[in-house]
Each structure stands twice: as C-alpha cells, then as structure tokens.
C-alpha cells in the first residue's frame, strides 16, 4: 500500500528476486506522468488544496519531485539501523544506489564529507558537520530514474492508481484490503504510506490495536540566499548537514535539504500549505540562489502527545495570516517589522517562490524563532553573508513524522505478514532509508517462501 520509495523498492525487489510472486500496489495518487500541480505562476499562483496533492501523492511518493538526494549514512535520515543493524542498513542503501544509477542516474555525482576541511571549520564555530555520502540525482534525473523503474515494473506488477485503501482487516491466512467498493485478499501486506499517510496509519493501528508512540515534529523556515555565499561548501559537499546547539535554550537547530542553485516550492500536507525546496542537475533549470531549511525538533511527553497537531497548528496560523507561505527578509525580522512587496523587490535576493510578504514572528513560537536566529548568525561565521539583511526566510517549513509504530527486527507488526515500512512507520525519514526498508522486507518475504 503506497507507491513511494518503500513501496517501489519492495515491489521491485520482489519482481527481480521472486518473479513468480503476484504483487499488487495500491496508490492514492496518479501515475508519474499524470502528476501535475496546477500552480503555474500565472493563472494559479498558490496552492488551491486539491483533494489529492500531485506533489505529495502518486508514483514516487513525496520524493518524486524532490531534489533526489540519497544520503548513505546512519547519522541521520532515520533509525533503521536500530532494527536491522548498522552494516546491513548501509549495505542496503548502497544497493539502492546501484539500482538508481542503473536506471538513469549513472552520470550523477556522489559527494562525501570524508576528509573535508569544513569539519574543522564547523567545530571552530560551535557547529557540527554530520558524516554522509550523498548521491544527488536532482529533480530532473530523479524523475527519469522513477520513470525507468516504472516502465520495467508495469508489465509484471498490478498497479492500482487513484485508489486509496480505506481499511485493512485480518483474515484467516492473510489480510483483506478494502478499496473503493471492492476488496482484495493477500498473504502478505506491506504498508508504505509515507508522511502524508500519517493520519491513515494512525487509524489503522488503532483498529488493529498495534501499539504506537509519539514521535517528534520539526518546525522552522526555509532560507534563500545567493548561491555564491554557500558555494565553497556546496561545490565540495553538495549538501551539508550542520547542527548547532543554541546558547539560550540548548535546543538543537539543523540545516536540512540544501538545494544549491535551486528553487523554493509549496507543499501540501493534509490540506496545509508549507514550504520545501528542489534543485536540478541540469544547468538550464538552475537559479542563482541556494536554499535550505533550518529546523528545530520538538518532542513532547505527558500529557501532550500530538506533536504533528502542534506543527499543523503553527502551519495553519501561517496559512491564515498569509493565505499560504509567508516570506520575510532577515533584516526586517531583526528590526521587528513585516516585509513588504516593495522591500523584497528592492532586495538583492530575488525570490524563486511567489509567497506573501509578512512577519514570521507572529507565527513561530519565540523559542523556535530565537533558535533559528542564533543559527543564522552561527552559519554567518562559516559562510559570510548568511545573515545579510536581504536573506529571505520562508515559513513555515514543517517536517511531520508518523507515530512510531511498534515493529520487530523484520519490520513486522504483531500480526505475522503485516509489515509497516518507510516514513509511514516513523522509523525512516529519508529517501535512502525508506527505499532500503523496502528492499529489506522484500528479502524477508522471499526467505519465508
């Protein structure tokens, strides 16, 4: 259930290693070529909240139109290694990389933090650079890879597009999957519904009495600035995952999803418009700006457990004030005033997303905003110009994490043959980890045949 990275790679592995196995994939969204967001920058300038978001749903999942970064590391992107072991997790991510590079990504570059001088530079300025090897496909090549994989799979696997699954029931010898006014029985069921399926998976777990526990939510902004400011980092590392501990509250703030010469985009999750970023491998689609997120993770304990609800309420406030995403100059934020169209037009950084000028201090909680401001000044020490007045901040960016589902080392629930994988499990938070979890479960199923 779900044709995102986890679902695709589990189905692909079953097709390759066990071709006699009948596999059906149910996907709420459309085929890859029919996934079209109506925003064109002309007639439709902002999100119109389609019932099924073409950016978030469909073949390829939310990652289909991402910048296609596959981080091969256990340091971030999920806790898959806690279930299957560090070595196996890395080996599976490397295997996923071979699939991507053999389906259109062979000319793309692998970046690495190994031996970089920037680790020392970060440490000298109270920052930490996390270790990773990064395969950057780019939004354009990522699409090609998915297209090639689908073309290889479509004649061997039964795909049901525009077909949301309403319920799963346990029956003798397997599971009954309900969709529209029909149902299908199966021996094994792999649930891979991603972050956009968070409410759905929560309901399924409640009905089947599968234990879950609260996860975190990441809240922050997307920063956009001239690409030359970060070029000394991005030319060598492409993406740098940098962590800072704030002096005021000792909260951790981190960079996320860095897009050199990229664009800022809207994202619709459960009817709420947030912000994200993309980048392209092809020079013809590149811009003069680089963007990245600055995020603060919030964990909650008793009595409050709804971390996603907390993030949604902040995003809704942004939508209420700005009709969608708000953009603000850093200089305006520090002067305690909202940005205006005139000041943004006069600025040195030309926005790549049509957003509403406003005041993010009316949206973000003070503790989170203080942490982001501290981080910007810390980054300014390793990338001078980050804290320039004309640096743009888009808000809000929220990364929702599913409730962490109770699964065993096979990624299997308390029900034999019912697996929950990818970001929908709350265990993975990245393309590489989600894809690796799909391969892992497919191999476990084949072992049991």
Description of each model-found segment:
Residues 58-108:
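Dinucleotide-binding Rossmann-like beta1-alpha1 core, especially the glycine-rich loop
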Residues 1-77, 111-116, 120-449:
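Residues forming the flavin
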